[in-house]
């Protein structure tokens, strides 16, 4: 198809306004109604509305393959929502399992495949090859039996950049991405110091506990120590460190030990920098101190679901260029929420 001097692809036509398709919306409303009856155990007293199951599954499969430049993420999340609801309604139907597997494969949602206990590999040779290549690509280097979501992988590949800011929904595990990066570095023999700023003291134990579980015996074999306080005795010894600290504790540590090299600074919950809270100035002071060092660390900012993660890189603009190339704002979520208003 030709439009002016530009080629118009079939996908451009299919996905241009698919969310406005009356039949698709009618099917989705019926699925939601049926799911609600089952959820609230009203399906025995209220008759479910009939709908064409195969048509609903085909729409989900189509949405999962969306190539729309602005709406593909929304389309893929909608595809997941449809097959998840249908799996709740018709979990024993092999056709539902087949289409759900295809949708989760298309969206790179390996956790979804596990939940429905699927070993889907594709319907033909080409799809099987693509599925295997995609699985290999999304394999977590530090955890070969686990897979990233596609959006997680995109963020992970930027964590070695001089500076990077990313925003993801809370369900996407932004701190998990950092932890897997640190683990892979240590597995491969890196002798560096990693500082991970968390906004509250309560999160210190939670995050440090997960890192200890991640690294296990490597802490001793690779000569690493987890530090959660500026006065930790381990800091007086010859080790590499993973620092998990609040901004106040890290600032105190940097002042008391100005020669301690920080190779990576991960700022979790980076939106706290701009929030109305007492810790904001500590974040700014830490960044300023590390920026003025002869050997700057890599600066990684992680935020939950904000539209403008690039705002934090403006703290570093005097030192780094290409702000737009170091930003990733993701809206894809592997989970769905069905919300009800009760009167």
Walk through the language-model features, giving the residues of each.
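N-terminal helicase ATP-binding lobe
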Residues: 1-343
């Amino acid at each position: 198809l030709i439009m002016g001097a530009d080629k118009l692809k079939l996908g451009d036509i299919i996905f241009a306004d698919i969310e406005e398709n009356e039949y698709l919306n009618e099917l989705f409303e019926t699925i939601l109604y049926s799911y609600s009856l089952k959820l609230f155990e009203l399906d025995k007293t209220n008759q479910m509305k009939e709908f064409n199951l195969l048509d609903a599954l085909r729409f989900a499969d189509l949405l999962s393959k969306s190539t729309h430049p602005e709406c593909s993420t929304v389309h893929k999340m909608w595809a997941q929502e449809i097959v998840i609801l249908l799996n709740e309604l018709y979990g024993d139907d092999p056709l539902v399992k087949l289409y759900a597997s295809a949708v989760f494969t298309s969206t790179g949602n390996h956790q979804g495949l596990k939940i429905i206990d699927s070993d889907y590999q594709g319907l033909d040779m080409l799809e099987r090859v693509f599925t295997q290549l995609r699985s290999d690509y999304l394999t977590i280097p530090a955890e070969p039996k686990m897979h990233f979501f596609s959006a997680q992988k995109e963020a992970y590949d930027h964590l070695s950049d001089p500076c990077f800011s990313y925003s993801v929904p809370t369900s996407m595990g932004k701190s998990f991405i950092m932890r897997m990066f640190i683990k892979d570095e240590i597995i491969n023999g890196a002798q560096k110091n990693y500082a991970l700023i968390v906004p509250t003291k309560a999160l210190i134990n939670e995050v440090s506990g997960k890192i200890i579980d991640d690294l296990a015996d490597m802490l001793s074999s690779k000569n690493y120590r987890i530090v959660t306080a500026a006065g930790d005795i381990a800091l007086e010894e010859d080790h590499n460190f993973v620092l998990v600290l609040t901004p106040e504790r890290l600032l105190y540590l940097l002042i008391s030990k100005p020669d301690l090299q920080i190779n990576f600074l991960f700022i979790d919950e980076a939106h706290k920098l701009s929030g109305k809270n007492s810790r904001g100035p500590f974040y700014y002071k830490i960044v300023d101190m590390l920026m003025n060092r002869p050997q700057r660390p890599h600066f990684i900012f992680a935020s939950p679901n904000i539209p403008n993660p690039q705002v934090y890189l403006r703290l570093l603009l005097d030192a780094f260029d290409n702000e737009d190339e170091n930003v990733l704002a993701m809206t894809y979520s592997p989970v769905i929420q069905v919300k009800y208003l009760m009167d």
